[in-house]
Amino acid sequence: MMKTLGLRILGEKNVGRLDYLLNRKSKDSWGPLNGQKIRQGVYADILKRIGFKAIVETGTYRGTTSDYFAASGLPVYTVELHPRMYGYSMQRFSKDSRVHVYQGDSPVFLRKLAADPNMPKSKVFFYLDAHVQDSSRYFKAPLVEELEIIFSAWSEAVVMVDDFEVPEMGYGFDNWGDERNLSVSCLRPLKNLKLSAFFPSVEAKLDTGARRGWIVLCREESVVKTLAGIQNLRSYVLQ
């Protein structure tokens, strides 16, 4: 009861700021990119081969992956829907000019970036992890809308999606049944975009960390050729 009262008095955003200042750590943190060494290696290789101008992340949580992205030296734009997690990350990066933290709905955030004349509109790396705000119940993932915005507004974009089903490789993914899971079937409405897809070529048992599935998406042929040469990535034909 006292905890609930405190939340009401302070507000969730301020409680999140206190979480950071009092060093209240999350018990379920695996590290950046879910602590998965294979995925981290693929990201590093992509970063080396493509001259990105910025990184955009949806689903900040406590900023572990945001901080990892910032080590690239590129500006990082990240959005978090949950007020408490936003407060935590806002406080964490309050003195870090590399990381720009926003609160709100990810498609709205992406539309604002798309309309911002100061935001690069080519060669941006996107990391999408805003699909679940409460693991105890189903929320419709904003993924399709996010991808429509990204590939309509940015050229030579590379998108990595977290928690995605990797066929027959043993990775975990967001699965709510009845075609509500994150899988290639949910990408069918985007057929007109003619996206190219890549999955990890390494089985989950050989990776580290949370062993969650992921997919990399792109559009331009030049980017497809670059990704095709990256170790531990395999091309997948979207139907």
Where are these regions (language model features)?
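A short alpha-helical cap/connector motif
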Residues: 1-125, 131-239
